[in-house]
Amino acid sequence: MLDIGWTELVVIAIVLIIVVGPKDLPPMLRAFGRMTSKMRGMASDFRRQFDEALREADLDDVRKTISDAQSLNPTAALRDAMNPLRQLGNEIKSDLQKATTPDRPPASATPEPLVEPVNTDAVGETAAKATEKVAAAAVSSASRQMDRAADVPKASEPKPAPKPRAQSKKPGTSVTKKAAGETAPKKSPARKAPGEAPAANKSKTRAASRKKGDA
């Protein structure tokens, strides 16, 4: 430990025997052994403390490395690494969409004419007026047709043929009857005046009176 050989130990023992004497040499050797044991204990304690300090230093380093590893977030690193790939994918998608979609014509710069709102009340009023006018015209035309139909005389209708009467003895009366019968249908298609009807009745009464006189 102290780099002392056997010869040196022998020299030291001789010097101690001469100086201390044979009586005091054993207790001195005991004290020397105790001192050496204490020194060895102190050295061992120092080594232990030194080893503990080294271990603590190593543990601190290990703790630092562990804390650094815990502080590191692998997901964030992966996201940072994947961001450029995502950007490239988005750019490729946009290019494909532009290539597939046809080019649209540019919008016309001329603004479209604004359509004014139609007033429904005014339209309804005009429609009602038009229907009223049409109804009034239809009523007036119907009334005119009714008036015209009423103006047509009943004499225009075909009269029933006169019944054959008994032949009289005189030929003159029969001739007059035939003449009257021939003239009557010829005048029927013509429109007679309202004053002709009493004249015909008068002629009939005269003919009847003549027949009675002849009889």
UniProtKB/Swiss-Prot annotation:
Membrane topology: Single-pass membrane protein
Transmembrane intervals: 1-21
Keyword Transmembrane helix (UniProt): yes
Matches recorded under Gene3D superfamilies: 1.20.5.3310
Segments of skewed composition (Basic residues): 203-215
The keyword Cell inner membrane belongs to this UniProt entry's keyword annotation: yes
UniProt subcellular location: Cell inner membrane
Alphabetical GO biological process terms: protein transport by the Tat complex
Stretch list, region Disordered: 95-119, 138-215
Molecular function, one GO term: protein transmembrane transporter activity
Highest taxon, organism lineage: Bacteria
Swiss-Prot/TrEMBL keywords: Cell inner membrane, Cell membrane, Membrane, Protein transport, Translocation, Transmembrane, Transmembrane helix, Transport
InterPro entries: TatA/B/E (IPR003369), TatB (IPR018448)
Disulfide bond residue pairs: none
UniProt xrefs under Pfam families: TatA_B_E
GO CC annotations on file: TAT protein transport complex
Amino acid composition bias (Basic and acidic residues), ranges on this chain: 145-157
Protein family: Belongs to the TatB family.
Self-association state and partner proteins as the record states: The Tat system comprises two distinct complexes: a TatABC complex, containing multiple copies of TatA, TatB and TatC subunits, and a separate TatA complex, containing only TatA subunits. Substrates initially bind to the TatABC complex, which probably triggers association of the separate TatA complex to form the active translocon.
Free-text function comment from the UniProt entry: Part of the twin-arginine translocation (Tat) system that transports large folded proteins containing a characteristic twin-arginine motif in their signal peptide across membranes. Together with TatC, TatB is part of a receptor directly interacting with Tat signal peptides. TatB may form an oligomeric binding site that transiently accommodates folded Tat precursor proteins before their translocation.
Protein name: Sec-independent protein translocase protein TatB
